[in-house]
Amino acid sequence: MNYNQWIKNAKQKMSAQGYEENAVEWLVMDMCQWSRTQMILNEKDVLSQDRLKQLEQGLSFLLKGMPVQYVVEQAHFYGRIFKVNPNVLIPRPETEEVVHYFLNQIRPTMTVADVGVGSGIIAVTLKAEINDLTVYGSDISKSALSVAQNNAKKHNCEIHFMEGDALKPYIEQGIQLEGLISNPPYISKEEVNVMGKDVLEFEPHLALFAEEQGYQVYKALIRDLPAVMCDGAPVVFEIGYQQGEFLTQLMQTWFPHIKTQVIDDINGQPRIFTFNWHKI
């Protein structure tokens, strides 16, 4: 059997169970370490027994609904490849827009933090793009921090990792930040019914769901900003498409002197909640 025949057969199996066929191609490219062009050029090659066994095992996971990124244990983000596993979220394309916006708000030599660092994709991307930054990454999950540390090492990026909830570790260590970015858990428990089966079954709920209709972590972050933020520091949150109005009202209530902004993503959905911190 050659690669083209195997891919065609695997796609038919995926389609029959209602799964995305393109995951098969990603499986082949990642396991063979091929580009799409290389996959096309090699499609007539006969599979070795070892490769066939490897691909069949991967396909068996795909047919159970497991996202291909977890099957191959890696995901692409901002032009780089990162290690992922079920202890961390799979990077979303929309988050690249959030990171791109933040990168345009900061300057080299700043001290910045990624709160809720997860797999480390944001923190590592910041350091890789602007090497002179001092970057902190914090998370409440030990398992997630382990993945983030591996990704920082993989990309030769020095990140200062800390375990803790929201801004508590920064307050405890007296760290002052000149920039803050966070993609925290922001899905409410009430939204479980509209979530994809693959997300609910395989991605970590600790990184997905938050109490108080999804606003718990945002409130904790915003409440403690006065203790850690330097004057003029940019703050950037990734948000759900329905959360911009509430967060705008919350900031107007707690810190009425701060001007906030909600920015849409490429699909026209509210994605970024941002402002520059100013002391009263």
Feature locations, PLM:
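Short clusters of hydrophobic/aromatic residues that line enzyme substrate/ligand-binding pockets
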Residues: 39, 47, 71-72, 195, ...
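A general structural motif
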Residues: 21, 109, 132, 174-177, ...
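N-terminal auxiliary segments of SAM/dcSAM-dependent transferases
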Residues: 1-70
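N-terminal secretory/membrane-targeting helices
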Residues: 5, 11-14, 20, 32, ...
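S-adenosylmethionine
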Residues: 138-278
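Alpha-helical elements of Rossmann-like donor-binding domains used by nucleotide-donor carbohydrate transfer enzymes
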Residues: 9, 26, 54-57, 97, ...
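Short, basic/glycine-rich phosphate-binding loops at helix/coil junctions
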Residues: 35, 78-81, 198-205
